[in-house]
Every structure is written in C-alpha cells, then in structure tokens.
C-alpha cells in the first residue's frame, strides 16, 4: 500500500479540465498530486474534507499586492498563485529577486512593464522593479505619456525584449495611463509579444463613448492588435474600463475570436475601481465622460470623499501616486451589478482581483507582521474577490454553477498564461502529476467579509489552502511562518 505525505480525504473534488466533480481522496507527495482516487488512501497526515470542495488553488492574473501581507490576505481568499501582469515590473529580474530573498506565501510571477520601460527612457528613471517606487510615484508626470519618436519606441521595445529573456510572463501595457500615445507603438509591442509567443496584458485606453477624441477606441485597439499581429491579447478588468458599454466591448471580443484571434478577458465583482489619483483619466475636466464627479473619488485611508474639483486638482498635484477609490457602479443596485455580472459570466472570462498594495495609515509599511493591524487598508477586492464571486454569482444569483465558477478561478487563468509558460500547465488542475496547489472550502458558507470601510477583513469558508503541498491556511487560520511560494517564469 502506498502511503502519501498528505491525504485530503472524502472531499468533493472539482477538476475543471476533466470535468470531475465527485467525492475522492487526493494523495500528495513532495508538493505534487500523486493520486486522485475513489478509494480511501493512506496518509502520514490525513485531513477529513467531508462536505468540503477540494479545488485547484485559485490563480490571480492581476494582483498589485505582491508583498507578504498582500499574499496572506489573498491566501485566505483561496489564492495560491498571484501574478502581476497588467502593470508588470521593470526590470523583472529585480522584482523576482526581491520576492525570492524575502520569501512569499504564494507562487508569484511578473510580466515586463511597458509603462515603466517608457518612464526609464522618457524620464531617465532609475527603475527598481517595484510598482510603488517606479510607476505609482511617477504616474502623474506628463513627459512619460507623450508620443515618442520611432527611435525611442525601438529602444523601449528592445528593453522589453531583454526582459522577456529574463523570464517575464508577457508584456503589461498600461496604455490607459498614457492615452495619447501613437497606436503604432502599441502594435510594435504586440508584435514583439507575438514573436516571443507570450501574451500582452492591457489596461485599455479610453472607449470612444468616453472620449470621442481618443486616437483609437480602447477595445478596437486590443482586438485589432490581435488580428493584425497574431498576438494573444488579454483584456484586463473589462468591467471597470467598459462600465456601461460592456456589451459593445464584449461583442467586439466575440467577433474577433470567431475570426480566429486569441483575446481573453478578466473581471472582478466590485463597482468601485482603484488607481493612483494622478491618473490621466481622473482629471477633473474629464470625469463627466464616465458619469463621475469629484465626489465619486475617495482616497484610500482617508475619511469621506473628495468634495470638489479644486481639492481633486490639489491632491493630484501633491500626491499623484496616492491610491483612490473610483465609484463607477453601485454594486448594491441589481441593475448596475448586472453590468459587472455580464463581464464575469462572459464566455471563458477569468476572475481576477486587481488587488491593490496595502497601505499603512501610520506611514511605515509593515508587510511582515500578522495579523494586520487596524491601520492597514486596501481595496476590499484584495481580500474578497473570490469569496464574493462564490457567494454572489453561485449561491445568491445562481448565474454560475459551482464547477463553472471554479473553472474561471483556476483553469482559465492557468491557460491564459500557460500557452508560453509550461509550468502553468501543472496548475489549475486536480490531477496526478500536477502541482499540489489546492484550495479546500465550504460551498455553503464561503464568503467575502471585506467592505469599503473594513477593507482588510479576510474571507471566510476557505478552510485549507496548500501551496506546493504545504499548508498556508489550515482550519481557516493563516500560518505566518509558511512561505512556500515559488517563482513562475516563462
């Protein structure tokens, strides 16, 4: 009789690739799933999973919360792999090195960053591979957002190409933060991704409905790039960049897919976005395009919302990198939540958080202490995206079956990255030979608990979370000494 290091016994195993949804034992040795059996297995450690779902660990394609504290909050929401793909990092070697030296609870990976490479060239920025120091600190400076000569574009593309050689998982393109750049530059970056066989991850520029003067409609730009370059284009947080125009945007994606292009999408189940308050599209004179006012915006960690345009201008000048809530849709209004739900239930859409770096109101960041103190704040999506998806879309609204919701949190994101990253093909699955990244949750009680006022309340109902066969969460308790996360590289 084979004895396994660990057996998860008698749980409801959901494997989205094979369609398995049945009571099984799962045997784990050395960080790898060795057996999925309808017969009882013998384990050195056996954990009774009766009445619980045993799922692949959730894979977040879009997290900016890449420190230890952010990982821990996401672990309690069922996540086992967090990837910084939309903003990316430049140089990626520095981002990977920092995570390796400090240790991480969850698996992690980075795309290279078009925006930060652009800042390096146009601002002369000495980049560190850290989102706060590089991108957020310089988000409001106009020099990096301007159109560039062909020579400069070639330099930027060359820098990104070298970063792909250092293991970057693709190219993050924050074109929505530099919305006047030449569309030809975007196509050059997409063409590089196509040559490398890796995806791009785009924060779209303005839709024509929101800015009739945009050089190109943000959704059209993404689908045309897929068609003309052959690149796999991933459309980030299609809910928050499309808002009430989501049907037109998803219609374009459907059409280009039918013609053979690869365009993938993601969404999160919240009505408020969050970004640096200095972002171009939050200029007071542009807010009306999204149906917003200064009062739609609130600074993370501050009481109340911004009262007027003059205050917004002052804040944008003095602290452009400060994180701001942007209340786009009222998620408690069913007719408005329906826009978000359409993005989440679109064919093969991934659930992804857009998790935000934690901020400590006292000033000094404290990413290693646990539990988080009352002065730690973030967007509730950082702590609650997956719990909320399972609560609202599966249990309450019934618009996704449980196996389909699991697929959107696991296999779909694994496959988005997996085309150019073979190690991702061992994730998002509960099969012999796959990584033992596993999430065990109670389908009847799993829920988000974070709110816009209590932003770091972790989800409930995620009973056990394993990364590489090691518990990061056990019996709903985070294990602060567990740092089994490994780098995911192309």
For each predicted feature, which ranges?
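Metallo-beta-lactamase
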Residues: 57-64
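Divalent-metal coordination cores built from histidine and acidic residues
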Residues: 49, 53-54, 69-172, 261
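C-terminal cap of metal-dependent C-N hydrolases
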Residues: 341-350, 354-356, 361-373, 438-484
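Divalent metal-coordination and catalytic microenvironments
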Residues: 11, 26, 31, 51, ...
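Histidine-rich, glycine-flanked metal-binding segment
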Residues: 1-56, 448
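Active-site beta-loop-alpha junctions enriched in small/polar residues
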Residues: 64-66, 87, 113-117, 176-178, ...
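Active-site neighborhoods of metal-dependent hydrolases
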Residues: 121-180, 223-227, 232, 236-402
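Acidic, glycine-enriched loop/beta-strand segments at the rims
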Residues: 14-25, 330-332, 396-407, 414-456
């Amino acid at each position: 009789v084979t004895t396994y290091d660990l057996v998860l016994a008698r749980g409801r195993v959901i494997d989205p690739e094979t369609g398995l949804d049945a009571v099984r034992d799962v045997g784990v040795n050395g960080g790898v799933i060795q057996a999925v059996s309808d017969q009882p297995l013998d384990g050195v450690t056996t954990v009774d999973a009766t009445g619980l779902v045993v799922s692949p660990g959730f894979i977040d394609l879009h997290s900016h919360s890449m420190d230890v504290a952010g990982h821990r909050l996401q672990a309690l929401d069922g996540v086992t792999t967090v990837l910084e793909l939309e903003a990316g990092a430049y140089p990626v070697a520095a981002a990977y090195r920092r995570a390796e030296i400090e240790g991480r609870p969850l698996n992690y990976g980075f795309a290279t960053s078009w925006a930060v490479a652009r800042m390096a060239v146009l601002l002369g920025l000495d980049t560190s591979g850290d989102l706060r120091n590089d991108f957020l600190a310089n988000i409001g400076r106009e020099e990096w957002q301007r159109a560039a000569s062909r020579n400069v574009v070639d330099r930027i593309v060359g820098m990104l190409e070298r970063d792909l050689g250092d293991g970057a998982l693709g190219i993050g393109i924050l074109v929505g933060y530099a919305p006047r750049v030449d569309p030809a530059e975007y196509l050059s970056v997409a063409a590089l991704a196509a040559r490398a066989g890796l995806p791009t991850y785009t924060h779209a520029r303005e839709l024509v409905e929101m800015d009739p003067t945009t050089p190109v409609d943000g959704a059209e730009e993404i689908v045309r790039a897929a068609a003309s370059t052959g690149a796999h284009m991933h459309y980030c947080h299609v809910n928050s960049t499309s808002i009430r125009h989501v049907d037109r945007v998803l219609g374009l994606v459907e059409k280009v897919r039918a013609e053979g292009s690869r365009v993938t999408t993601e969404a999160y189940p919240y009505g408020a976005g969050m970004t640096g308050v200095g972002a171009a599209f939050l200029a007071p004179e542009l807010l009306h395009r999204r149906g917003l006012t200064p009062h739609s915006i609130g600074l993370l960690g501050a009481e109340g919302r911004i009262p007027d345009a003059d205050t917004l201008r002052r804040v944008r000048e003095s602290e452009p990198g400060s994180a701001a809530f942007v209340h786009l849709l009222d998620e408690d209004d069913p007719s408005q939540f329906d826009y978000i739900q359409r993005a989440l239930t679109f064919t093969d859409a991934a659930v992804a958080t857009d998790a935000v770096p934690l901020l400590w109101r006292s000033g000094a960041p404290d990413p290693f202490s646990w539990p988080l103190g009352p002065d730690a704040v973030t967007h509730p999506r950082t702590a609650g995206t997956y719990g909320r998806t399972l609560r609202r879309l599966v249990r309450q609204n019934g618009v996704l079956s449980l196996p389909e919701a699991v697929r959107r949190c696991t296999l779909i994101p694994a496959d988005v990255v997996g085309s150019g990253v073979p190690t991702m093909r061992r994730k998002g699955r509960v099969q012999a030979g796959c990584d033992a990244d596993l999430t065990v949750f109670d389908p009847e009680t799993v829920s988000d608990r974070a709110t816009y006022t209590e932003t770091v309340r972790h989800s409930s109902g995620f009973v056990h979370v394993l990364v590489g066969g090691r518990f990061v969460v056990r019996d709903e308790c985070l294990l602060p000494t567990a740092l089994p996360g490994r780098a995911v590289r192309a």
